[in-house]
């Protein structure tokens, strides 16, 4: 108890500075790493470790091992004003953006690959000037997150030299001065101190408050097994001050020790462990279940429209566009049918008789009306979930 008291005082002093190397960051996390059982409910994990204004890093890759369960809980609880970093993001980031929870987004690519080339609420927010956004190449962003795990002050790269990414800034230098958690520069060309006359590009290194990650297996102390590609999840788990891990199943310490080579994230990096079966739904989780084709198609279709009012406006524009195309070729039967259908869809929506499913409808159906992950699974039903389940030793579903 006396030793713990000393450790607590030392670590509290370090934590107060919030600065320093990756070693110091790790020591901060070790204080909570002494806790051998970090299992808690998803509600409690989000309430305790996700705060308004956090710099949030999201694990996974487009439709792979995305922490949808945690994002859904964040939406239910109402935390907002996040600075979000994600490797290639997907619908989980799109949902946060569509609900207005993101103050700034630093990314390289956002899509539900194979379903939506560019996530629709993300795209609409940028086109309407509602989202503060910065764009890096995928390789540079991954290196930035890795540099964060190493505690580097900045990162020298050569990967963006000569590209438009150097010239075009989504967040101006002036605006950056008004956002304390955004670095003062997107990038700057500097001289390589090792090779006189050679130029390199210096990019900032994010300071991550909270990482949210979904894995296949985790032990109560937070030790994680990731099957398949790890993406940037290990880096953000190390870099973040707080890490929430959801998992398909909680395994024993003995299970972890049987094959320690499978360990990818150490318990010292994790503050909360949450059992959340199908926690990546509608995305896939390698060796457990495939992505839900029906769910991702539903989201793609619904996310075209923010809400009913937006649906009416967009359908009106579509009808006008179809009518204009018909004017140029009035004898074209295909254009005539398209114009008739577009006009009918607009009139039905305007009258309220038939409004297509919208983004808001999707969230009400699959997020807000579900008290928790168990309620979501009940709504999806066992038959649908079993069709997604991977066959042992194959790594994919044979019925989906």
Model-assigned labels for residue ranges:
Residues 5-327, 331, 336, 340-400:
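Conserved alpha/beta enzyme-core scaffold
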């Amino acid at each position: 108890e006396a030793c713990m008291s000393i450790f607590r005082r030392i670590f509290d002093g370090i934590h107060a500075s919030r600065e320093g190397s990756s070693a110091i960051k790790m020591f901060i996390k070790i204080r909570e790493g002494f806790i051998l059982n970090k299992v808690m409910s998803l509600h409690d994990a989000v309430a305790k470790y996700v705060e308004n204004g956090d710099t949030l890093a999201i694990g996974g890759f487009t439709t792979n091992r995305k922490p949808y369960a945690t994002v859904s809980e964040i939406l239910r609880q109402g935390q907002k004003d996040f600075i979000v970093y994600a490797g290639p993001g997907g619908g989980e980031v799109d949902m946060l953006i569509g609900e207005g929870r993101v103050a700034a987004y630093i990314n390289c690519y956002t899509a539900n690959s194979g379903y939506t080339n560019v996530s629709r609420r993300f795209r609409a927010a940028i086109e309407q000037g509602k989202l503060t956004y910065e764009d890096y190449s995928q390789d540079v962003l991954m290196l930035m997150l890795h540099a964060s795990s190493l505690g580097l002050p900045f990162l020298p790269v050569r990967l963006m030299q000569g590209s438009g990414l150097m010239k075009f800034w989504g967040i101006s230098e002036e605006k950056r001065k008004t956002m304390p958690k955004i670095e003062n520069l997107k990038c700057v060309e500097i001289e390589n101190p090792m090779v006189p006359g050679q130029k390199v590009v210096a990019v900032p290194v994010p300071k991550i408050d909270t990482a949210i990650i979904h894995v296949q297996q985790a032990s109560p102390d937070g030790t994680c097994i990731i099957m398949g590609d790890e993406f940037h999840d290990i880096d953000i788990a190390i870099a973040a001050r707080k890490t929430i891990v959801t998992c398909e199943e909680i395994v024993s310490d003995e299970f972890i020790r049987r094959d320690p080579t499978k360990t990818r994230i150490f318990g010292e990096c994790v503050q909360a462990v949450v059992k959340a079966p199908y926690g990546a739904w509608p995305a896939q989780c390698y060796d457990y279940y495939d992505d839900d084709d029906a769910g991702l198609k539903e989201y793609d279709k619904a996310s075209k429209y923010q809400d009913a009012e937006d649906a009416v406006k967009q359908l009106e524009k579509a009808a006008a566009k179809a009518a204009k195309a018909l004017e140029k070729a009035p004898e074209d039967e295909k254009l005539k049918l398209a114009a008739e259908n577009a006009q009918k869809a607009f009139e039905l929506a305007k009258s309220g008789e038939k409004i297509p499913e919208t983004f808001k409808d999707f969230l009400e159906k699959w997020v807000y009306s579900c008290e928790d992950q168990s309620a979501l699974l009940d709504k999806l039903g066992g038959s649908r979930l079993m069709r997604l389940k991977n066959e042992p030793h194959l790594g994919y579903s044979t019925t989906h």
